[in-house]
Amino acid sequence: MRTLTTDDIESVEIVRGIPSAEYGNLTSGMVNIKRVRKATPLTARFKADEYSKLFSVGKGFTVPNHDFTLNVDGGFLDSKVDPRNNLENYKRVNFSVRISKLWRRDKWEMTWTPSADYTGSFDNVKTDPDLSYQKIDKYKSSYNRASLTNNFKWTFPRLKWIKTVNLDASVSAQSDQLKRTKLISPQRATVAPTGKEPGVHDGTYLFSEYVADYLCDGKPVNAFLKAKGEFGWEGAKYRLNAKAGGEWNYSKNFGKGQVYDLSHPISTSWGARPRAYSDIPALQNLSFFLEGNTLFLLGKNKLELQVGARSVTQIGMSERYLLQGKPYIDPRANAQWSFPAIPVAGKDLHISISGGYGVTTKMPTLDYLYPDLWYNDIVQLNYYDVNKPLEYSRVNIITYIEDITNYDLKPARNHKWEVRGDISFEGNRLSVTYFHENLTSGFRTSSFYAPFSYRKYDHSAVDASGLQGPPALENI
């Protein structure tokens, strides 16, 4: 609901069975949404209930004799998932411009369908009404996303063996910010590690209440490029279609990440260190696919076969990674046998059986490929002076920093096969599917043991009466 409006949706296609080799990262079919690209009258819609208020307006324009269409629409949504809890509510604004242009020539036709979209989800400064210090505790979040797409489609009416050539490209930029202010009340004097370098350093005590400011800033950018060709041959009792292509995906976050004061963390148990999202390398995937679809007419029976394969490769990584530049092949296959129609009460009853097998490769995400550095803060001295805690207390820490990156990560491979039976009669369909899915690998974090050396200072040896400042380590 935060990013998608239903007013500009023309059709929704649900593809069952093992997905085509054209699509990656899918195991159980696909939902394909097409947006309106045609002349439409000016429409406005308003909806209000106990959970939301929605207003949208849109219109489609066409230029006669020029094969040109322009669709413009926008909307506003005020969502209240729980009207009693304003922390769960949000507002969304969306705007979309879509163009469709057709060029006709003797040997070819080209359709150009670009679009520009904006979505913004924003929340005003909010407080928890159940807190007595609500004037201090507050947060504000904002989400803004703009995207551009360019789609080209060529058809060749005079060529029997080549059907279409498609070239699709898109780029999107997003800004996602969360600002939070929180009153922290430590139950006791707590240590806040502040060192960003390995070695010995003094930490900071959290003695009393303080106000923590926190910012999470994300600016992800995504790019996509895909080229595809479709081919076909037909005979008296068969039809063969084939398609081949490739695609490239790029994802990079240019945000500041988590920004906060190490000496005043958002939680007294916080032990991590800030890391800019922009320091994390981009994620790039390169894929190619090849697939054939065959239809055979066997008397009054019909047999459809779909066989294909898809390769998936992660690129742009360090050579230390096992995944870098290594292709993984995903085979996909589907078959369907349709029996002759059976007349029942003057109507046709259709029965078919289907089956399929497919492999899907799931690459690790950024948090597994580029995890945060692990900080091990060991307290060597924890001296708290009861008389002058601010002036004479001292906490000494040795910090170890470990790179926990696993350069030998392998992708997860999901194997699935299924068998399905379908019965349809007068627009009604009964479908029964049995499937078996086998995923024996995946990604998770695990602990490890390692020795660390440190000094243990005996704070009982400190002579509190003779202190003129924090105790010196040399005297303990």
What function would you assign to each model-found segment?
Residues 1-2, 22-45:
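N-terminal periplasmic accessory domains that precede
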Residues 43-78, 85-167:
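Transmembrane beta-barrel wall of Gram-negative outer-membrane proteins
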Residues 224, 410, 429-476:
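Outer membrane beta-barrel strand-and-loop segments of large Gram-negative receptors
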